Regions:
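A conserved segment at the C-terminal end of the G1
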Residues: 1-9
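Short glycine-/polar-rich loops that comprise or flank the Walker A/P-loop
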Residues: 10-12, 89-94, 133-136
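ATP-dependent small-molecule kinase phosphotransfer cores
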Residues: 13, 17-74, 78
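Conserved nucleotide-binding/hydrolysis micro-motifs of P-loop NTPases
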Residues: 19-23, 81-82, 100-106, 145-146
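Conserved catalytic network of the ASCE P-loop NTPase/AAA+ motor domain
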Residues: 66-69, 87-90, 131-133
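Conserved phosphate-donor/acceptor-positioning beta-strand/loop module used by diverse small-molecule
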Residues: 73-79, 88-112, 127, 140
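NTP-dependent small-molecule kinase module
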Residues: 107, 114-115, 129-164
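Short, well-structured alpha-helical segments
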Residues: 117-128
């Protein structure tokens, strides 16, 4: 998803996740890493945040800490299961929960073609887990047109940045 040019010059940083999955530019712009290298780097503390999901390992690079120290607004895509850890490490972080109706999510996962039906069912069951207690996310319903979801996302980011 392309962001308006105002975000590139407005102090926003969109973090590229590190994932133990080959790069597929059509699905997600991420950095790929083999599982063993990932494990070694994780054990050495070379990630800002890491977690497991969907039989893969994910991480945010240490550059997150540098960007935050420079006063930038950092935007990262993480699992809701790592939100508590993120809030512990970054107490001022805001949580945006982007969701969609379950039928819409199922259709999108099937169309993406990365997972078999059993994996999709398990993923949908896992995604219904709530955010941790004490976290009040800004909820964005992405069930409709992409333009509507993007507009809601942009508005939420601008609101959060204005509060910093």
């Amino acid at each position: 998803m392309a962001m308006p040019s105002s975000f590139s010059r407005g102090g926003f940083v969109f973090v590229r996740r590190i994932v133990t999955r080959p790069v597929d530019a059509e699905l997600e712009d991420h950095d790929s890493m083999d599982p063993e290298t990932f494990r070694q780097m994780d054990e050495a503390g070379r990630f800002a945040l890491s977690w497991d999901a969907h039989n893969l390992r994910y991480a945010l690079p240490l550059s997150v800490d540098t960007d935050l120290a420079l006063g930038k607004t950092v935007v990262a895509n993480v699992s809701r299961h790592v939100v508590a850890e993120a809030r512990d490490k970054y107490p001022s972080c805001a949580v945006l929960l982007i969701t969609a109706e379950i039928s819409c999510r199922a259709e999108r996962l099937v169309r993406r073609g990365r997972e078999n039906p059993d994996q999709i069912t398990a993923r949908l069951a896992r995604e219904s887990a709530p955010v941790p207690p004490g976290v009040t996310p800004i909820i964005i319903d992405n069930s409709g047109l992409l333009a509507i979801g993007v507009t809601a996302f942009v508005m939420a980011l601008r609101t959060i940045a204005a509060q910093e």
